[in-house]
């Protein structure tokens, strides 16, 4: 046994200086160093004692290192540590044991936000919570009597001239599409027109001058419905005064502006939004030629209304609102006037004024019937030229042209009862239209032809008489 201890001391020679660093720290190390030095110098200490001291010192260092982490259980650790030191067994501090520990390691948590109140973070109270009415403290130094019972209202600034035109132009253009005067009135009430109320009729009439007859009729209805709700009769009078003043400029874009403005004035007087003495107030005071022409037109229309003509028919009823019988009469008059004057452009203009592109097949039908009923070549050639012009200008579409010819093909047996030579005339006219490019080859081939009668004078040789039947 003594031999083994001597070998251990020889293998692990102990340096007194280094022993103090490896065994202890602080005051305990200093005290232990002095004792060990004395013991070593006395040559009576054993190797097992030195190994046990090393183990105990190492266990103490581990306990001190983990003391900051295990601050919450310092008493138990210190107790365990003292027991470990006495027993010579180290406290298990393996990494696996620390992973299974669910307590905080740094005292700051995992860095997640804390729950902020009953409704959670960023939520004001629980769902469905009703807040009390905030009571005003009279003793508050910032209390103001004017703040009690305040009623807040949205203030809309009045429109200037530029904003007025930009805002109202799309409103009136949309009105030409839907025709609802109530919707326009509601939109105008939301705007602060101020002194620009008289500009509404001016802008509406200016846009209607560039439109169709149906647009002018809708404008007259709009002015009649807005008067008394959005604007007054004085505003209407101011607007027509401005229109008469601006007629020279309006006539540059619309040459018929004086006559159209005169019709607007006559319609306004008939609707009761202009006084009957409005035209008389301008007598002898007008120097502008266009304004005088407008007033003269209004005077003529008003005088005609006294004889029985209604003032609400100055624009007629445009588009599909017209009855079919009325459209048939208008087209018949259009063709008769064309055969008398021969003016293709005027006939085309009158057809567009009817605003019934879905009814153009009636013109094709009536025109061909006139050709079948005519006795000379002039009507044949004039109707051919008219259809050719309307086809090239795309006034009459291919569908309307086809439908008009198909109506003739279906009714030719009845027409032939009144016009005996209708089949031969129709075949000739259809062939001429095909040569002019008005109809297609398929439509030409659909033209019906009546079987020719066999005359008694025809012999077995099959010779035909020179005249055709």
From Swiss-Prot:
Protein localization: Nucleus; Cytoplasm
What is stated about domains?
Binds EIF4A1 via both MI domains.
Residue ranges of the motif Phosphodegron: 70-76
Protein name, entry field: Programmed cell death protein 4
Q: Mutating residue 457 to A/D leads to what result?
A: No effect on interaction with EIF4A1
Q: Which GO terms describe its cellular component?
A: cytoplasm; cytosol; nucleus
For this protein's source organism, the top of the classification is: Eukaryota, Metazoa, Chordata, Craniata, Vertebrata
**Chief location of this protein within or outside the cell:** nucleus
Description of how the protein assembles with itself and partners: Interacts (via MI domains) with EIF4A1 and EIF4A2 (via N-terminal domain). Heterotrimer with EIF4A1; one molecule of PDCD4 binds two molecules of EIF4A1. Interacts with EIF4G1. May form a complex with EIF4A1 and EIF4G1. The interaction between PDCD4 and EIF4A1 interferes with the interaction between EIF4A1 and EIF4G. When phosphorylated, interacts with BTRC and FBXW11.
Sequence ranges of Gly residues compositional bias:
114-125
What keywords are assigned to this protein? Acetylation, Apoptosis, Cytoplasm, Nucleus, Phosphoprotein, Repeat, RNA-binding, Tumor suppressor, Ubl conjugation
Q: Where is the signal peptide?
A: none
Residue(s) carrying N-acetylmethionine: 1
Q: Which disease is it linked to?
A: Decreases benign tumor development and malignant progression.
Q: How is it modified after translation?
A: Polyubiquitinated, leading to its proteasomal degradation. Rapidly degraded in response to mitogens. Phosphorylation of the phosphodegron promotes interaction with BTRC and proteasomal degradation.
What does the UniProt record report as the effect of altering residue 418 to A in this chain?
A: Strongly reduced interaction with EIF4A1
Known role:
Inhibits translation initiation and cap-dependent translation. May excert its function by hindering the interaction between EIF4A1 and EIF4G. Inhibits the helicase activity of EIF4A. Modulates the activation of JUN kinase. Down-regulates the expression of MAP4K1, thus inhibiting events important in driving invasion, namely, MAPK85 activation and consequent JUN-dependent transcription. May play a role in apoptosis. Tumor suppressor. Inhibits tumor promoter-induced neoplastic transformation. Binds RNA.
What region holds the MI domain?
Answer: 163-284, 326-449
Where does this protein have compositionally biased stretches of type Polar residues? 1-23
Q: Which parts of the sequence form the motif Nuclear localization signal?
A: 58-64, 448-454
Give the span(s) annotated as Disordered. Answer: 1-37, 58-128
Domain of life assignment: Eukaryota
Q: In the UniProt record, what gene is named as encoding this protein?
A: Pdcd4
User: Record's PANTHER family?
Assistant: PROGRAMMED CELL DEATH 4, PROGRAMMED CELL DEATH PROTEIN 4
């Amino acid at each position: 046994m003594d031999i083994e201890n001597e070998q251990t001391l020889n293998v692990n020679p102990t340096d007194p200086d280094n022993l103090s660093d490896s065994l202890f720290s602080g005051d305990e190390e200093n005290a232990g160093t002095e004792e060990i030095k004395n013991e070593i110098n006395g040559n009576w200490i054993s190797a097992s004692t030195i190994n046990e001291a090393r183990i105990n010192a190492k266990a103490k260092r581990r306990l001190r290192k983990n003391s900051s982490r295990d601050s919450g259980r310092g008493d138990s650790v210190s107790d365990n540590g003292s027991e470990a030191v006495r027993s010579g067994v180290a406290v298990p501090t393996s990494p696996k044991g620390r992973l299974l520990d669910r307590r905080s390691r740094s005292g700051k948590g995992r860095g997640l936000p804390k729950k902020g109140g009953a409704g959670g973070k960023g939520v004001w109270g629980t769902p469905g919570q009703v807040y009390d009415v905030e009571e005003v403290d009279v003793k508050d130094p910032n209390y103001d009597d004017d703040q009690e019972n305040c009623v807040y209202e949205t203030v809309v600034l009045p429109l200037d001239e530029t904003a007025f035109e930009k805002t109202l132009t799309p409103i009136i253009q949309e009105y030409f599409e839907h025709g609802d005067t109530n919707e326009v009135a509601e939109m105008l009430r939301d705007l602060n027109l101020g002194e620009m109320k008289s500009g509404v009729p001016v802008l509406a009439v200016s846009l209607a001058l560039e439109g169709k007859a149906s647009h002018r009729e809708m404008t007259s209805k709009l002015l009649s419905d807005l008067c008394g709700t959005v604007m007054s009769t004085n505003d209407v009078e101011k607007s027509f005064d401005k229109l008469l003043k601006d007629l020279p400029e309006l006539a540059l874009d619309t040459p018929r502006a004086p006559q159209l403005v005169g019709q607007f004035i006559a319609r306004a007087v008939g609707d009761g939004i202009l006084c009957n003495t409005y035209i008389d107030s301008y007598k002898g005071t007008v120097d502008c030629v266009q304004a005088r022409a407008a007033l003269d037109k209004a005077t003529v229309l008003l005088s005609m209304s006294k004889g029985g003509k209604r003032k609400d028919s100055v624009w007629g009823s445009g588009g599909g609102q017209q009855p079919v019988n009325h459209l048939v009469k208008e087209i018949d008059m259009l063709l008769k006037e064309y055969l008398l004057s021969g003016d293709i452009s005027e006939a085309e203009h009158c057809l567009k004024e009817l605003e019934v592109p879905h009814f153009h097949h009636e013109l094709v039908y009536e025109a061909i019937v006139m050709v079948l009923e005519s006795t000379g070549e002039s009507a044949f050639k004039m109707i051919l030229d008219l259809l050719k012009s309307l086809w090239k200008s795309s006034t009459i579409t291919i569908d309307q042209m086809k439908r008009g010819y198909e109506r003739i093909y279906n009714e030719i047996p009845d027409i032939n009862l009144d016009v005996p030579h209708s089949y031969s005339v129709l075949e000739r006219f259809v062939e001429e239209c095909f040569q002019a490019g008005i109809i297609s080859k398929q439509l030409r081939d659909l033209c019906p032809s009546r079987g020719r009668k066999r005359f008694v004078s025809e012999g077995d040789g099959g010779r035909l008489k020179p005249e055709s039947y």
